[in-house]
Amino acid sequence: NAVAAYVRDCGRDVVIFPAGLEGKFSLEDTWCAGLILADLGAQELGDGARTAKLVCEQIDRHELVNTTHGKRLQNLGLHGDLAFCLELDRSSGVIIWDQASGWGALKR
């Protein structure tokens, strides 16, 4: 997992923040956060992180097509996009938000 590798290599504290959808909880974002935590082998977790990790362990990623956002993509006919989103380890790049500029930057 490129994100977990970046976190291990950066030597800093990192916040994993599931963005959600329109200000609401998002199962797929929480699942992804749990996957990153599992890949990191994180040991000391707060309640939110433990919940994310449990979500990832208990829900098969292919079930994420049934989430609110998954159904939205299906209704828009974006089946290829949805299939792409369900792939793991597709890229070695990680988008990092730069606080100073307010922009994301691709790190490899």
Question: What is each PLM-predicted segment?
Answer:
Residues 1-22:
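Internal, conserved structured core segments that host functional sites
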Residues 10, 27-108:
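Long, charged alpha-helical interface segments
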